[in-house]
Amino acid sequence: MNKNNPTLKETLVAARQNYRKGDLKTAETLCYKILSINPNYLETKILLASISAQEKNYIKAKQLLNEAIDIEPNNVIILNNLGTTCKQLGELKNAIGYYKKAIQIDPNNTNAYYNLGATCYDLKQLKEAKSYLQKAIELQPNFALPFLILGNTCVDLKEYENAISNYQKAIDINYNLAGAHNNLGLVFRALNDFKNAISCYKKAIKIKKNHAGAHHNLALAFKETGKFNEAIKSHEMAIKYEPENLAHYFYLSDLKKDILDIDLKNKIEKIIRKNNTTKNNVAHGNYLLSKYEQKTKNYEKELNFLIKGHQFYFNSRKTKFETLVKYNFDDMLQIANGIEVEKLGEKNKYEIKPIFIIGVPRCGSTLVEKIIGSGEMFIPMGEETSVLEEFVTTKIMEKKSLNLGKVSEIRNELFNKYKKRGLISDKFSNIFTDKSLNNFFFLKFIKEIYPNAKIINCKRDALSSIVSIFRNQLTELAWAHDLNNIFKYFDNYLQITRNFNEINPNFVYELQFEKLVNNPEKESKKLMKFCGLPWSKKCLEFYKRKDLISKTASNIQIRSAIYKHSLERYLPYKKFLNQYGKKYSWFN
């Protein structure tokens, strides 16, 4: 090489070497030197676009790639990179177009199938995502990333066994893929396998010690198993690696209230004013600021911060949440009213004895479940399994009908689903709890499938529940981030349960939370009698259990003895909520 007068090819080699070393500035300078001599040097434009992408200047990267594709319209590498750049700019439909064009030119292009599958996953086009990712794996079975995203897709499809299998395959191919360990932990946690969940998070952290997400998830797992000191340490590690992520402070503040000092308040206000702060961060900043107002009993300001926080949180997941709101207020009502089963010649004999606990969030259902599960029999507690909802919605999609089929076949399928959750055991006479609160939508279905099932409707003062829902970040409940939707959801719940009870009197046990906490022994005895279970003092000593697990917003309170709740505690909020509740007789 002539160092005084290198060729363009030699200069490009030098630019690539500097790019690989991370010296982006020198690489960029060399690229522009080449383009000053030959403005249409294709490889240089591609490299310069990669440099811009590394610097997160995706607009510039897209411009350079468009210039490159004009030079060579059928270049699959450029099309792939254009798709990825559009994806970073949030132009997901354009990204899909580029990936599909790349596949049209090269039907065996693994990267294009992987990128297309990953983009469809981001758009929650799950069936399409699954198909494209499986094609990428077929073309290149030793490529770990498609297995990782396919695992994520299976989680969203509630195919937990397939998700576990795909994450494990990703790990087998590339053990150092920290995201696969972390996401595998999330599945184990969803299945209440906390031992394996915690192990997975720790492996992710060992591979990548600054994996803030894994530290956060480890903290939640510790919190849900009652290991609060370990949870605090893990939240603090998440903060160490993401000091401006306000979600970490929000979750830590539940366990360590003294962090809510003036210094943190100033930091929160500074962060949420930044132009590049994410909607999720602004949401958690407002949630935190509401806690300061709650401490000083400035109820109107507290609610205003909560309203703002929930708006930002909803908008950070707008596409997904708008779909879920429609599902909760339109689809679920149609399903509740329309699902049918075939009972011809069916016998009412079945092996399992489920105890369903229904209601709205923050109604005392966690307390009720722990009382039932802590008696002499120590029956398995399912918490919020979502088994019925997932089963019903999947069946409707498969059959394209509200007729779900024969009762006997449905019972067999549900038996297997509950068994996979570890809830069915001869040791406990196949008795277990399912505390999926929105099972009130499936009351008619439950009665037809399990005519001898026990159903407990947990009722609490509406104002208390509504304020508690709005104060707590119930992350995945799309309707819980808007007061109008909360009131509407309550009204649907009250109408559905009232209508069912009129047709089926005494089938559902109506439990009043306030009565339970004011007279726990008397009310818990009545409850256990209804369930057909023996009562003992252990029922009220649930908080002493070493194996107590709770993933609900009550997981801190549930580790203490029952205490009385004053209705007056929430009265100051009523005047601010009247504008939402005035059209509902049950609120006035």
How would you name each of these model-derived features?
Residues 16, 43-54, 77-88, 111-122, ...:
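Conserved alpha-helical positions within TPR/SEL1-like repeat arrays
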Residues 252-253, 265-276, 286-354, 405-423, ...:
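PAPS-dependent sulfotransferases, especially Golgi type II membrane carbohydrate sulfotransferases
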Residues 348-448:
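Phosphate-binding active sites in nucleotide-utilizing proteins
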